[in-house]
């Protein structure tokens, strides 16, 4: 697949123009975005950023403290729901749309199907979550197809483990978390979602969820009982097929490593047999298992959180020297094009937060690396392009530098850009308008320049270790090349203005098949008004340039 750009967005937040923002506020007080908020205009503006895919986060019905019993939806016990809105990752019904997101609750599935059609009409693709490891404690599907048994519906709850069961149980023990359960009763206790095999999870556990049983007996040395195929495998495959039939284009699979790789290889193969173009992205954090989840699990792409994200964050925060970026991509050993790069998502702290850089513009060079160093896809999180700081204390989600996934809230930067549905950016500051322009230029370059989407990469960092006019603690440089198209990237992670010189080794000319000594016209794709003299590419001539703080150059070299 050609390089693509994902825009992650929580519909709950995106279309909410209510600015009340009462701490721990209800739906009625703080409001909630809707699927219908993604109008043709909204989608057009998102696409104009250079986006190719939208990951609609929190689409599937999850536990909530909002009462929908008048629509035939069972009420959730508030003691086991995180936040008034509830976590998008505590799924309550795998076969339904979250009612919060519908203008008409009774037609919520049609509103989702219409959203998919609008998104495709805007020439964008649709990704949704698949949350396979855990469900809400009071999971019950009231929307499953006729004849589909509920998860846990046929379980033997007096058995701690059986491959026939969908959950794990703690026989003869009541659920007694280390918090006030306000009368909630669960007996026997089910095992909590983060592999907490005791009846008393803490506030730091995923106490609002229960773990699904894929036939691994954790209490007997992780014994695998996969023959015959466990019941959970069949039910979860059918859920994937259900959503694939809604014409979506991909799944982002939550905490994929907490589910056996054997299931993924089995299920993904069956889904792709019927829907060959659908993509699967795995949230993974164990580099030693990456190849296993690609080769045996059949995933198309994996999160590169532990490697490139952590590296770019530390480089931007000036904890690591910039030259360590080289070690990061080299450590992947050939699978770097199958990683998903990002600097923000719903789990991570905002770049502009006081916990990261304090200003979204400081991550411009890091974002250039994430987007252009390899052929891998790249993702941004709604509001990232607007400098969102994530420094609100919304309710269950405290002041932690993240935008809440638990509470009803209005995100100031998104509201300022959306301007009540006009999506004209009228309420943005000049600085944040400029930041959005940067993202728009960068991401469009990322998907249109063949040197980036299909080309070779040559890292120039090692060739400049001993260059006194290039600081490998603060600067980074590399080539991308496809046929006769050549790009030179020079990035400054320093907070100071400086002049720098980039040297070119003989190996670069050999690897990229560039003839030494040729002259090139230089154009900065991020600012085409900037003037450069002719560049002679040679081992004897360095490229000399001025660099502004926290900025990067994407230079297109045209032979003359």
Task: Describe each model-derived feature in a short phrase.
Residues 4-6, 52-55, 123-127, 249-252, ...:
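Beta-sheet entry/capping signal
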Residues 1-2, 10, 90-91, 100-117, ...:
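Alpha-amylase-like alpha-glycosidases and glucanotransferases acting on alpha-linked glucans and related
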Residues 11-13, 60, 98-101, 132-134, ...:
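Short, flexible loop/turn elements at secondary-structure junctions
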Residues 1-125, 133-135, 140-144, 149-158, ...:
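N-terminal structural segment of carbohydrate-active enzymes
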Residues 15-18, 62-68, 134-141, 259-263, ...:
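Short catalytic/ligand-binding loop motif for oxyanion handling, primarily in non-cytosolic enzymes
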Residues 13-18, 46-54, 58, 63, ...:
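A generic secondary-structure signal for well-formed alpha-helical elements
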Residues 2, 17, 21, 26, ...:
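Loop/helix patches that line or flank the sugar-binding groove of alpha-linked glycan CAZymes
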Residues 495-560:
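C-terminal beta-sandwich/jelly-roll accessory domains of carbohydrate-active enzymes
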